Regions:
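N-terminal active-site segment of His-dependent metallophosphoesterases
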Residues: 1-55, 63-76, 80, 144-147, ...
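Active-site neighborhood of phospho(di)ester-bond hydrolases with catalytic His/Asp-centered motifs
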Residues: 12-14, 33-39, 56-61, 84-87, ...
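Residue-level detector of flexible, active-site-proximal loop/helix-junction positions
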Residues: 17, 62, 138, 156, ...
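Short, solvent-exposed aromatic-acidic interface loops
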Residues: 161-173
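Short active-site segment of divalent metal-dependent hydrolases/proteases
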Residues: 18, 42, 90, 120, ...
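Helix-adjacent hinge/juxtasegments
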Residues: 56-99, 103-104, 109
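Conserved beta-sheet core of the metallophosphoesterase superfamily
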Residues: 56, 93-162
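Beta-strand-turn-beta hairpins that frame and shape the catalytic cleft
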Residues: 2-11, 75-84, 125-131, 154-162
């Protein structure tokens, strides 16, 4: 588990599907970095997020055109946290195990692995690595669930995650 003498906040979002509620921008205000795990579907979403903090984004299965040309997986580091992001967890883990992600060796262990795709918020610790799916920021998997995003915070005790519910799309009410 990564421990940092400093403090960093990372906004994590996925599956916006062309909708970015203003509350997301409020929740991400002051973060050091934003990770978008795919299915962006609208370039203005990334523009709005980039106005808040640097953004690492990957293509999802619904992204086309310019967004479809985003990488499928990305490795990076922010605030001492080594992360890998990809849209589909199964594909990401296969490519990670095979050493096929640029900048990541076969035996490297990231601190944080972020995926999206299934629209279900989830957090799991495996051998000191935090696996995180922030859920969908626009279209939750189950009808009675709320859209969600996540905030990852680093500090002297390691990584912590907080899920944040955001409003449903107006066209998804009811």
């Amino acid at each position: 588990m990564v421990k940092s003498s400093g403090h960093a906040r990372i906004g994590v979002i996925s599956d916006t599907h062309g909708h970015l509620d203003p509350q997301v921008l409020e929740e991400f205000a002051g973060v050091d970095h934003i990770i978008h795990a795919g299915d962006v579907m609208d370039g203005t979403t990334l523009e709005a997020l980039t106005a808040i903090a640097p953004v690492t984004a990957v293509a999802g299965n619904m992204d086309e055109g310019k967004l479809g040309k985003l990488p499928r997986e990305v490795a990076g580091k922010v605030g001492g946290v080594r992360f890998i992001v990809g849209h589909k967890r199964k594909r990401l883990l296969k490519r990670l195990a095979a050493g096929k992600i640029d900048g990541v060796g076969r035996h490297d262990s990231p601190d944080l692995v972020v995926c999206g795709h299934d629209h279900l918020p989830a957090v799991e610790w495996v051998d000191g690595t935090l696996f995180l799916n922030p859920g969908s920021a626009s279209a939750p998997h189950y009808e009675d669930d709320d859209p969600t995003i996540a905030i990852v915070e680093t500090g002297p005790v390691g990584l912590g995650v907080r899920f944040v519910r955001v409003p449903r799309r107006a066209d998804d009410e009811g």
